[in-house]
Amino acid sequence: MALDVLSIGSAVPQTLVSQEDALTIAQTILGPDGEDREWLGKVYAGCGIGRRHFSVHGQVVKDILSGTNESNSPFLPRKQFPAGPTTKERMDHYEEFAGPLAMQATQSALADSAVDPKSIRQLITVSCTGFFSPGIDQHLIREVPLSPEVERTHVGFMGCHGALNGIRAAHGLASLCPGEPVLMVAGEHCSLHNHYLWEKEKLVANALFGDGAAAMVLRQSIGHPAEPSTGLRLAGSASCIVPNSTDLMTWKVGDNGFTMTLSPRIPALVRRTLPGWITGFLAEHGLTPADIKAWAVHPGGPRILDAVEEALNLGQNGLEDSRTILAEVGNISSPTVMFILQRMLRRQQPMPIVALGFGPGIAIEAALFR
């Protein structure tokens, strides 16, 4: 049975940082190293990002840029702690920001759906950038409020394709309550895990990632033959773990935050793997890649988008929505694909649409909307 997307809401933290200021912040945190500073500048300039939102108070950014200490934040560069804040300090910030930002996205989605919050039967939360319990799910139940008897599921630590896993979970759980609304919320606070040491493979993530949250209200199509309010209907999904790629992208808990490694081999792997796999998936639905009107591809970075455009013969402007979202908010991990779908809906993008995400594994997730 198909799954209707009734609405999508999104939210970003208040602290807005241009890519130029983000580079200055990185250079200040990392300290002097002439050759590496030049390399870092090229990385930040080549990301296709104009600005990002960070889950810290604005005074923290002002302090780093001006060399002051009004905020007394653990995120300020400290000689006695060269690796930056501890994981606990980063998780304290995650707990402060995660619930309220998820709440903003949820309120937006619920307002657009006209669904009574107390009628939500299933709640799915998605995040890979932090932990605390009682968590985001219970924050939403208290503050929206939702029914205290809503059934909860958490999709955790799956990386940038996590929202697609959340949508798949919503599809399955919606079958338990036909015709009743399901809420799926993804929220990430990647900037809390900025790396403070000169390790190039880990510093690329500092240049790419931002923070944000998005929410979807969904409902199984049974009993609702009319088109959903967004016109977005999930027809199917697929998943693929690429062989011999385990170490190309990793996301692990460390003593000073979570650490990501990104191999420069990933774009070549995408070009090699994606065409055959996606063609097989679409064939199961009577489609070919040429039938797809738009591709909502998670913008892991400009080189990933280039690789997808080449692999699928989309041309240079084939992923304009993905590049626009990357420029406006950066790579915000799991919610990013929801931001892209929201943008497509606002400009009334014709169907079908395929959403794609990439994560540690290397894993590829796809969702087909018709």
Named regions from a protein language model:
Residues 93, 103, 110, 128-130, ...:
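Claisen-condensing/thiolase-fold acyl-transfer catalytic domains that form or cleave C-C bonds
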Residues 111-118, 173-181, 219-230, 286:
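Secondary-structure boundary elements
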Residues 85-86, 118-122, 144-156, 196-201, ...:
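Glycine/charged-rich beta-loop-alpha catalytic/anionic-binding loops adjacent to active sites
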Residues 45-49, 97-113, 169, 213, ...:
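Short, well-ordered amphipathic alpha-helical segments that serve as non-catalytic structural scaffolds
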Residues 43, 47-145, 289-305:
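Conserved beta-ketoacyl condensing-enzyme motif
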Residues 1-93, 181, 190, 196-272, ...:
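Condensing-enzyme catalytic core mediating Claisen C-C bond formation in acyl metabolism
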Residues 4, 119, 151, 179-181, ...:
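Residues that mark the start of a beta-strand
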